[in-house]
Amino acid sequence: MKTDAFALRHIGPRETDLQHMLQTIGVDSIEQLVYETLPDDIRLKAPLNLDPAMTEYEFANHIQELGKKNKVFKSYIGLGYHPTIVPAPIQRNIFENPGWYTAYTPYQAEIAQGRLEAILNFQTTVIELTGMEIANASLLDEGTAAAEAMALLFDVRTRDQKKNNTHKFFVSEEILPQTLSVLQTRSTPIGIELVVGNHETFDFSTEFFGAILQYPGKYGQVNDYGAFVAKAKENEIKVAFAADILSLAALTSPGEMGAAVVVGTTQRFGVPMGYGGPHAAYFATKDEYKRSMPGRIIGVSVDANGNRALRMALGTREQHIKREKATSNICTAQVLLAVMAGMYAVYHGPKGLKYIANKVHASAVTTAEALNKLGVFQTNTAFFDTILVKADAQKVKAIAEKNEVNFFYPDAESVSISLNETTSVSDINQIIAIFAEALGKEAVTVSELTTASQLPASLERTSSFLTHDVFNNHHSESQLMRYIKKLERKDLSLNHSMISLGSCTMKLNAASEMLPLSMPNWNSIHPFAPVEQAEGYITMLKKLEQQLNVITGFAGTTLQPNSGAQGEYAGLMAIRAYHLSRNEGHRNVCLIPSSAHGTNPASAAMAGMKIIVTKTTPEGNIDVEDLREKAIEHKDDLSCLMVTYPSTHGVFESSIIEITKLIHENGGLVYMDGANMNAQVGLTNPATIGADVCHLNLHKTFAIPHGGGGPGVGPICVNEKLVPFLPTNPILKVGGEQAITAISSAPYGSALVCLISYGYITMMGAEGLKSATEHAILNANYMKSRFEGHYPILYTGECGRAAHEMILDCRAFKENGIEVGDIAKRLMDYGFHAPTVSFPVAGTLMIEPTESEDLAELDRFCDALISIRKEIEAATADDKNNVLKNAPHTLAMLTSDSWDFPYSREKAAYPLEYIADNKFWPSVRRVDDAYGDRNLVCSCAPIEAYMEN
């Protein structure tokens, strides 16, 4: 046996476990199990045509060699991406630490207090630097955040504006080009008309509901927008700012100028450029708009003892509850990167951020003054970090690239130079020497940075920020390291136990896949660097696209969408473009089964589609007759069907080919949601079932870690007819011949983390990928067999099998006074994160073990739920003081002098023998969600200030 095969490390069950597992299920082989699970007509007839699998050692050498093809030049391109210094303790203790990167979105607050606090720090940083009242837990990138700001301002129009269909949105010509492209994509299907122009000549017409300004502008100009905002307010036009987060340590905050929304990226707070991402965008607004905000919001509440506890707030705004009426389709954002950016603010504190901002500004002023002496004149009347000079762009570019330096060239006579945190005096002298050579003059040299500010006094920041203790007490490395560890210890991640969240695929994120992310050759490249400097990246990304084409059976892939929700949106926009190209723009009806994930209707609404919900049968399958009826009824305006396969109920529906054929016969296309692709890879694929487009979650099926709520990557794979419509980028041309405008800010989205999926596929190979799928199905059916007789299993296939996940029905336990949430909280006492609660059916648990979990871990989890089942039996409806209702139990409870519970401390904390060996303690008791929403606090202000009398 090849013991160096990566698949052996990735897949949990050992060869010696198989017989026992198969026997428990009641089959003779994995082949028989797969045969009984997958419909015969959708099985692949040949293995995937992929390269032979590499070992981990071979991949490490391969990725290092490939990385050498990337040329890391000094980058002064700017445009929202800047070289930054990643503090080593943050890189080592967060970015490279599975305790942080393998966690899931903090749905179970009691075992997520660490990252909830870290995100609260991020929100506080954003609120105080922007001068706003509330901020969310991050968004995907600056372009997406700007589009969400536009959507929010459209949503909060006045009654008269809605009545009069006021639909124009002003965009300053200073906006970043990639942001403009994303705004164009988002505005068209929802009926918003963009008007791009000079803010100084804007007429404040009543036809406008909102405006967005860049602060500072794309080439560095800093404007005082106070008068603009005041005039806009008089005309009921609300103004959003896209602001550079570092500049706000030196400049007057947008909040002080009257902004309604402020967005931007926190990339330059210690997160590497990574050829475009991932980075955490931010979104801040006024308290009055909180219920229209997109994304997650972390708020302060109390636990069952009245102690301060954190949790996700205002969840009813989100797509999994509001569906097509949600504020946004975004679920996964960029939590890991938000944690890094927030910790950067903690480490540097207000004085440190001010120092860095002033140093960056001084570098820009020093460069401008030196170039001025050469006769190269700067055109910005005021600037923070970026200067725009008049020069022969072609000549400067040739000399700069010879010296391994990148500037940005807006036109033939202009050069934009964006200075950053890493810029030194010797870097400035190199810049001066490049221009001197271009002019044929002798270079002047500088020996130190100037102390003179170039900012107008009216725009210099005078207000304080980050005054809370957390930003002023962790400035030595020991302090920071211990603070990070303190938070990490409060969180349950994959490095402690399995996380069986259904529809989330919490599989192994192997160290060998993650290592390249820390290599400078991969993480230090600007997304708009000339392509010849990114040969390693282009090779890797194109290869990954080819691998995904083979796996899905499709003809083309774009990696641009940087979350599953963005992938859904991109797929629907490609379908929309296809119909428009055939003069069938009237095709706008989207059929969605009632069992679909909430992102589906939310994405369809964003794509301007009319949503028709189709029924499901009592067995949980799509009701084919109801679908037929609705497809025929809407055949003249049918755009598409959105279908998840295997279904959200964890079943391979045998009628899938009939379903897709039905849609095609009535003029529509089929969009397959790839959330459950982990049950397909190597066994079947979207093309075989008749889909036209699918999105994949690289953070599920293809091993990118969830990061506590992001990053994610949601590429779309399409058939021949949709290839021409894959999205482009305004600076680096990518996508199809009739490409839609940008979905995300960067041409390849979150390119850096694509290395993980590339590594996963490359090391697994065709055989390993197929084996992973088979073992995912094996693990799910083994658990299902163990649960039978203890919990009703809600849906199964025709042979009684689950796909890769199953639903346990907990609704009957209400007779014993037990809710499904009680089971979720009690699992924490057993050392486990709960499965998915009340989705897709209220009162149920959806369990997905993945292929990475070994037999011993599966058994521990099964033992825990079976033990809880016995505890449920012992409970009575009128008993509110039992071990389930009081769960989870904290160490403080167990060690308290008083114990007023009718069960032992041992039963509370150590209900099964295995727990004592590796006990995980929740850090708070059950969190009061309702209290937190009534008393919303989303920053680090002391809780006492917000308590109701």
UniProtKB/Swiss-Prot annotation:
The family database entries (PANTHER family) matched by this protein are listed as:
GLYCINE DEHYDROGENASE (DECARBOXYLATING), MITOCHONDRIAL, GLYCINE DEHYDROGENASE, DECARBOXYLATING
Where are the disulfide bridges?
none
Taken from the UniProt entry, a GO cellular component term is: cytosol
Q: Which family does it belong to?
A: Belongs to the GcvP family.
For biological process, the GO terms are:
glycine decarboxylation via glycine cleavage system
Which SUPFAM superfamilies does its entry note?
Answer: PLP-dependent transferases (SSF53383)
This protein is called what? Answer: Glycine dehydrogenase (decarboxylating)
Annotated coiled-coil positions are: none
Q: Which residues carry this modification: N6-(pyridoxal phosphate)lysine?
A: K700
Its UniProt entry gives the catalysed reaction(s) as: N(6)-[(R)-lipoyl]-L-lysyl-[glycine-cleavage complex H protein] + glycine + H(+) = N(6)-[(R)-S(8)-aminomethyldihydrolipoyl]-L-lysyl-[glycine-cleavage complex H protein] + CO2
Cite the source lineage: Bacteria, Pseudomonadati, Bacteroidota, Flavobacteriia, Flavobacteriales
Question: What EC numbers are recorded for this enzyme?
Answer: 1.4.4.2
**Keyword Oxidoreductase assigned:** yes
- Required co-factors: pyridoxal 5'-phosphate
Q: Which NCBIfam families match?
A: gcvP, PRK04366.1
Q: Pfam families given for it?
A: GcvP2_C, GDC-P
Task: Give the originating organism.
Answer: Flavobacterium johnsoniae (strain ATCC 17061 / DSM 2064 / JCM 8514 / BCRC 14874 / CCUG 350202 / NBRC 14942 / NCIMB 11054 / UW101)
- Function according to Swiss-Prot or TrEMBL: The glycine cleavage system catalyzes the degradation of glycine. The P protein binds the alpha-amino group of glycine through its pyridoxal phosphate cofactor; CO(2) is released and the remaining methylamine moiety is then transferred to the lipoamide cofactor of the H protein.
The UniProt subunit note reads as follows:
The glycine cleavage system is composed of four proteins: P, T, L and H.
What molecular function does GO assign, one term?
glycine dehydrogenase (decarboxylating) activity
Q: Which InterPro entries match?
A: GcvP (IPR003437), GDC-P_C (IPR049316), GDC-P_N (IPR049315), GDC_P (IPR020581), PyrdxlP-dep_Trfase (IPR015424), PyrdxlP-dep_Trfase_major (IPR015421), PyrdxlP-dep_Trfase_small (IPR015422)
Q: Which domain of life is it from?
A: Bacteria
* HAMAP family tied to this protein: GcvP
Say which enzyme class the record assigns.
oxidoreductase
